[in-house]
């Protein structure tokens, strides 16, 4: 594969702490860079990703974006539960608002965004993944839509557009794991390739899109969103509002009790 550090055509250097950014010709590559915690989505990471996409939308040298995870274990294990647990109610509300904004930003971005799912993709990781235009995967890819296990709502607006309503219901109701072969057969991932070829193949597919006129791709994407269920954005924000109303007052300890007990983490005392 071409040198990921080339940054050919980038309009300006950008420095981040929790994501890495590279560019190959007209394809930008964003790596979620917290492998020590399976690329858990901290608020800082989410904001950095949102900032990068905002900048990329104004960059004529970028025709497509790829998002992947650092390391060989995970695309993303989901939200950073421990960070959320240690925040107060005001911080959690601000974090939830920021996550909602960035998720819709990814879904509606004027640039096509492809996910290269290099490992497990759980919880909030699946929310991010299903908000992208489409996904590439390997034999290491696996998915779990875990919101139901914590009494939460996620991906009700996005997953049905990828796999259809009956399959989406099964996966959202059960929270069971979906391995690579099944993910490919149900349409959750578009291409299933050997793990050693995943990034090469994803760059190849992205380059095939990026060579086209950016405004043409953006117009197609915008119209597809408009046509999906008539108003996909309304479906998205209905889920966000439903989350607020249905789970008002639910503490992190209550919502993620099994996870926190399994990890054996104690609350941080300040």
Where are these regions (language model features)?
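Terminal peptide-recognition signature
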Residues: 30, 34, 49, 67, ...
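C-terminal alpha-helix plus adjacent terminal tail
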Residues: 2-25, 59, 72, 175-180, ...
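Short, glycine/charged-enriched secondary-structure capping and boundary segments
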Residues: 36, 44-45, 79-83, 128-131, ...
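Crotonase-fold acyl-CoA enzyme core
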Residues: 104-214
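Charged catalytic carboxylate motif
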Residues: 44-48, 98, 105, 201, ...
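Glycine- (often His-adjacent) and acidic-residue-rich active-site loop
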Residues: 69-105, 121, 267
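Conserved CoA-thioester-binding segment of acyl-CoA-metabolizing enzymes
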Residues: 2-68
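A general structural signal for well-ordered alpha-helical segments in protein cores
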Residues: 81, 99, 156, 165-168, ...
């Amino acid at each position: 594969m071409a040198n990921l550090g080339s940054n050919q055509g980038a309009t300006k250097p950008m420095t981040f702490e929790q994501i890495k950014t590279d560019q190959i010709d007209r394809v930008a590559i964003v790596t979620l860079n917290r492998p020590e915690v399976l690329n858990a989505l901290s608020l800082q990471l989410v904001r950095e990703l949102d900032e990068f996409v905002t900048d990329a939308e104004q960059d004529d040298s970028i025709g497509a974006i790829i998002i992947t995870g650092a390391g060989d274990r995970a695309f993303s294990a989901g939200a950073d539960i421990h960070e959320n647990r240690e925040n107060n109610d005001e911080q959690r509300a601000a974090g939830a608002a920021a996550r909602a904004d960035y998720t819709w930003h990814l879904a509606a971005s004027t640039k096509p965004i492809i996910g290269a799912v290099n490992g497990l993709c759980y919880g909030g990781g699946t929310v991010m993944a299903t908000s992208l235009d489409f996904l590439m995967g390997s034999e290491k890819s696996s998915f779990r839509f875990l919101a139901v296990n914590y009494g939460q709502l996620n991906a009700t607006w996005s997953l049905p557009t990828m796999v259809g309503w009956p399959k989406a219901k099964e996966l959202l109701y059960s929270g069971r794991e979906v391995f690579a072969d099944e993910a490919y057969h149900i349409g959750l991932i578009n291409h299933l390739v050997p793990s050693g070829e995943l990034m090469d193949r994803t760059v190849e597919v992205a380059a095939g899109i990026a060579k086209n006129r950016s405004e043409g791709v953006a117009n197609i994407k915008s119209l597809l969103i408009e046509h999906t269920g008539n108003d996909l954005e309304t479906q998205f924000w209905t889920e966000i509002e439903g989350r607020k109303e249905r789970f008002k007052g639910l503490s992190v300890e209550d919502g993620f009790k099994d996870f926190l007990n399994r990890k054996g983490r104690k609350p941080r005392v300040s």
